[in-house]
Amino acid sequence: MGNRALRYRIYPNTAQMEQILKTVGSCRFVYNDALTAKESAYKESKTVLTAHDLIRRLPELKKQYPWLKEADSIALQQSLRHLGTAYANFFNPKLHAKRPKYKTKRKSRWSYTTVMTNNNIRIGENHIILPKLGRVKAVISREIPEGWNLKSTTVCVERDYSVYVSCLFEYADISVSYIPDPALSIGLDYKSDGLYVDSSGRCCGSPKYFRKAQKRLTKAQRGLRHKKYGSRNYRKQNQRVARIHRHTANQRRDFLHKESVMIAKSYDIVCIENLDMTAIAKRDSGLGKASLDNGWGMFVSFLEYKLRDRGKLLIRTDRYFASSQTCSCCMNINPKVKDLKVRKWTCPTCGAVHDRDINAATNIKREGLRILSAIELDKVS
């Protein structure tokens, strides 16, 4: 079974918007209360409270705080399950997740998740029916494929008070009888001041949407600084700032979707490096903002599921593979070109002249095909 989410814009009326914000606040309160209870129980008696233990505390908590009854009960339970997942991720050494912390109204995401039970969530042509909200006007921008079963929905309020619903569907995996052709393979080398350079020499530059919006954003944030916090004018100006951020994020997401679908349609095997983007963004190279603006991680996630749906392959090479230092002609390793400032170099062994990025992409492609061959040999043996 596979999972896929579809995101729709909804337009709640005043009463529905008030109910959404109440539910978001209630989920935040329950989450913080459970975090306190969980930490206290462990400190006092070394007892580990599970998500199920925390959910059993909800009836008592509702008696103590009657306003919690106004929120969707399933959403409150889901917030406690999210806390359990956060702790599981924290104790998983492979994920390197941070310790769960308290949610705040100013910094935390305004969202809640509710689960499909007894057909309580329904999607129509121009509306969505949600628990505690009823019929909400929506823009159903994409039809639901046959055989997709709705599992849950997440209602998210952006900082400019636009509201979206992410609907999670479950569907049966259909085995695609497609054999990837190694001749239709390509290597992609990450480019900090762009997006990538491929093994054919094509350079995909980043539109740098955040940098283009920075002047307007600075002006809007400067106006926010002169408003009294909590006032009506402060909220209006804060929405202007949030709209700029949302527009920039939407532009970036749209560009990455188009770029990833173009590659997924054109190639059968795509080889990339398994990069630690957090470390790259923090590196003292002056390219931290550019690395975050180009959205490489989002691009890879889009590319991965688009290739998988078509029966194609995404292969990751080891992050310590010397793709830039290896001559793609004679395979000699030249450690002198490890410095990122060296953009063009000549191989001291065979005399081949290389562009740093194209050479790296070619080596990534070759290494990816080698990994694929090794996997196929293991299957045969």
Please provide the spans of the model-predicted regions.
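Nucleic-acid substrate recognition interfaces
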Residues: 1-381
